[in-house]
Amino acid sequence: MSFLSRQQPPPPRRAGAACTLRQKLIFSPCSDCEEEEEEEEEEGSGHSTGEDSAFQEPDSPLPPARSPTEPGPERRRSPGPAPGSPGELEEDLLLPGACPGADEAGGGAEGDSWEEEGFGSSSPVKSPAAPYFLGSSFSPVRCGGPGDASPRGCGARRAGEGRRSPRPDHPGTPPHKTFRKLRLFDTPHTPKSLLSKARGIDSSSVKLRGSSLFMDTEKSGKREFDVRQTPQVNINPFTPDSLLLHSSGQCRRRKRTYWNDSCGEDMEASDYELEDETRPAKRITITESNMKSRYTTEFHELEKIGSGEFGSVFKCVKRLDGCIYAIKRSKKPLAGSVDEQNALREVYAHAVLGQHSHVVRYFSAWAEDDHMLIQNEYCNGGSLADAISENYRIMSYFKEAELKDLLLQVGRGLRYIHSMSLVHMDIKPSNIFISRTSIPNAASEEGDEDDWASNKVMFKIGDLGHVTRISSPQVEEGDSRFLANEVLQENYTHLPKADIFALALTVVCAAGAEPLPRNGDQWHEIRQGRLPRIPQVLSQEFTELLKVMIHPDPERRPSAMALVKHSVLLSASRKSAEQLRIELNAEKFKNSLLQKELKKAQMAKAAAEERALFTDRMATRSTTQSNRTSRLIGKKMNRSVSLTIY
């Protein structure tokens, strides 16, 4: 007798009852089974893999099930038809502590297993013992008679009856779907049986691994809907993260284990679930970004300040902060067009470049009715092309000092763009904007109201629709008037030097040259290193610098870093306003020190004169006193004596 038998004697059994449970999985070509199999296939063939859960009774007084490798009661299988043919598959497990004579009542000392509706294989995890069911009137399988509802009775009766499809016992028994909703299944995971593997092979539809075994159609449909509704994210091609993503290829597939608080399950997420969560979503197009009109809700349009090939630019004031912005709106719908990529490229470049004093600042972008809108910094001076047109109308030109300042500031903007491994590829007067600001001088802070402020002109680079990477260029050719010859020949080895070439021609246009040709002999002469005719006299050093910038060999052209450090641009004749202000403050400080020293010297001189005068006075006074107190010794003195008698 085992230890369990000595401590706890087996409970009394009914007449003819056995201590073991025998359950059969009956597969018959009846209509009920076919209907149930069709329902299970509709739920998804991946739900019956058995990888995610296994049967286990909570708070069961029985010991846990032994693994197949551990020593234990031997397993016996009753003869039956082959798994491939319609018939019944019977698997018996010998319960520990089985009493003798069980073979007579139940057909042998065989173990128990749960019949799983719609699974095709029984779970090897241990089910409750026979005494647990002997006192109950419910069973997970239907019995033949209303009086005998125990698992033993069902097993004995089924041995002699024909094949029947498994069905719930009676209304009190929880149905299979409700049982699944209880989520009473835990590790260890149930391995696939031969029959379930065969069914998985025959399945026509393949689901993602890791799908929950007990996910019904409503939940799975809801989950797929949620996945489809997940906000998508664009990948910025100009960020370092995008390079790492493309270089690494697909994300590594790994498994993770997490705890499900709702049912106490230690579940293992599969590879494809993680891929669905971490895989970068496809690019958001203009059509998918439609929303309520943000332009009319958040901004008040003041006027139209410009237009071009891409669209129109409007001067707007934001209702929330009251600041003025430039809103760029595409003329025609961009969804699915070639201009859509240019619009997205401009947004990507603005987001990566961030804020720089010589690059137009970017704030936000969105889509409305298939149109792209970009919120940028408002430059009150307009574009350089507008200024050149105005100068041409009044026959006035930028002076050499102003041209040097223009070249220096735009060169600093290009240096910043090139330092981010990007190239602009469309430098021209219409893409350079002017911002005029009033900056208080230090003299105003000291109380000098004659020169209280100075106008500072800032040149900023805008329109980043042609920006591309230096390492992996996707060149979209810009204006042919400012296009370098090597770019036209599809030689992209020196793309930053193409921006230098275009900048030189931009300065030439600002100097008063005639409009540049789009093609022809004059176009080729410029690509050979000949400057267009300039209607004003420039210094030889500045002219030579412009010639070097349009040299036919791109390697001979200076880089943006070398350009901003050139001696011609940093000569003493042209100093910035900040440098002049610093020198002025230094001279004022020196002047104040000299004034203080002068006052000290004057005070010292006055004190010395006062001390000298005081010394003279003291000397004169001492001489006078000495003369009055002196006596003549050895001489006769006449004294008068008066006597008054009363």
Swiss-Prot record:
Residues 299-569 form the Protein kinase domain. Its main location: nucleus. PROSITE patterns: PROTEIN_KINASE_ATP, PROTEIN_KINASE_DOM, PROTEIN_KINASE_ST. Its EC number is 2.7.10.2. Residues 158-170 have a biased composition (Basic and acidic residues). Residues 1-181 are annotated as: Disordered. The active site is at residue 426. Mg(2+) 1 binds at residues 431, 463. Gene3D superfamilies: Phosphorylase Kinase, domain 1 (3.30.200.20), Transferase(Phosphotransferase) domain 1 (1.10.510.10). Mg(2+) 2 binds at residues 342, 465. One of its GO terms (cellular component) is nucleus. Residues 94-103 have a biased composition (Low complexity). GO terms for molecular function: ATP binding; magnesium ion binding; non-membrane spanning protein tyrosine kinase activity; protein tyrosine kinase activity. It comes from the Eukaryota. The modification Phosphothreonine is found at residues 187, 190, 239. ATP binds at residues 305-313, 328. Phosphorylated during M and G1 phases. Also autophosphorylated. Phosphorylation at Ser-642 by BRSK1 and BRSK2 in post-mitotic neurons, leads to down-regulate WEE1 activity in polarized neurons. Phosphorylated at Ser-53 and Ser-123 by PLK1 and CDK1, respectively, generating an signal for degradation that can be recognized by the SCF(BTRC) complex, leading to its ubiquitination and degradation at the onset of G2/M phase. Dephosphorylated at Thr-239 by CTDP1. Dephosphorylated at Ser-53 and Ser-123 by the serine/threonine-protein phosphatase 2A preventing its ubiquitin-mediated degradation. Binds 2 magnesium ions per subunit. Changing residue 123 to A: Abolishes phosphorylation by PLK1 and CDK1 and binding of the SCF(BTRC) complex, leading to stabilization of the protein. Keywords: ATP-binding, Cell cycle, Cell division, Kinase, Magnesium, Metal-binding, Mitosis, Nucleotide-binding, Nucleus, Phosphoprotein, Transferase, Tyrosine-protein kinase, Ubl conjugation. SUPFAM superfamilies: Protein kinase-like (PK-like). Acts as a negative regulator of entry into mitosis (G2 to M transition) by protecting the nucleus from cytoplasmically activated cyclin B1-complexed CDK1 before the onset of mitosis by mediating phosphorylation of CDK1 on 'Tyr-15'. Specifically phosphorylates and inactivates cyclin B1-complexed CDK1 reaching a maximum during G2 phase and a minimum as cells enter M phase. Phosphorylation of cyclin B1-CDK1 occurs exclusively on 'Tyr-15' and phosphorylation of monomeric CDK1 does not occur. Its activity increases during S and G2 phases and decreases at M phase when it is hyperphosphorylated. This is Wee1-like protein kinase. It comes from Homo sapiens (Human). The gene is WEE1.
